[in-house]
């Protein structure tokens, strides 16, 4: 029996169920989304440590824009906050970050944070 650990080159995850998780724990939805962002942070660190070359995170779909203005606003605030944190994690772990998708509906400051994240990690 071969017991050698095989590490995949590419792992893709879809962020889904944060609101249901929060509801099950009797928490507001925004805390479920925050927990999802924290899980992504940990996943980025773990993937880098394990030598996973590519990590794709599907984090926000066009359907999410149909949520309440309050929930979308909370998500955008989380994205701005975690873009800054992810920059530190990416630099510390030699990770390159590339956002794929439509940015036109994001606020100017969020787009700038994403651009900075991509630019400052492009050589990793």
What are the language-model segments listed below?
Residues 1-124:
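Flexible, compositionally biased loop and terminal segments
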């Amino acid at each position: 029996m071969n017991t050698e650990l095989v590490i995949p080159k590419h792992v893709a995850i879809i962020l889904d169920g944060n609101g249901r998780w929060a509801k099950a724990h009797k928490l507001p939805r925004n805390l479920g989304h925050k927990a999802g962002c924290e899980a992504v942070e940990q996943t980025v660190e773990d993937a880098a440590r394990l030598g996973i070359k590519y990590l794709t995170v599907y984090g926000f779909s066009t359907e999410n824009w149909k949520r309440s203005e309050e929930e979308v606003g909370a998500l955008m605030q989380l994205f701005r906050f975690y873009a800054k944190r992810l920059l530190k994690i990416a630099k510390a772990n030699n990770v390159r970050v590339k956002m794929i998708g439509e940015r036109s509906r994001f606020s100017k400051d969020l787009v700038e944070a994403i651009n900075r994240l991509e630019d400052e990690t492009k050589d990793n």
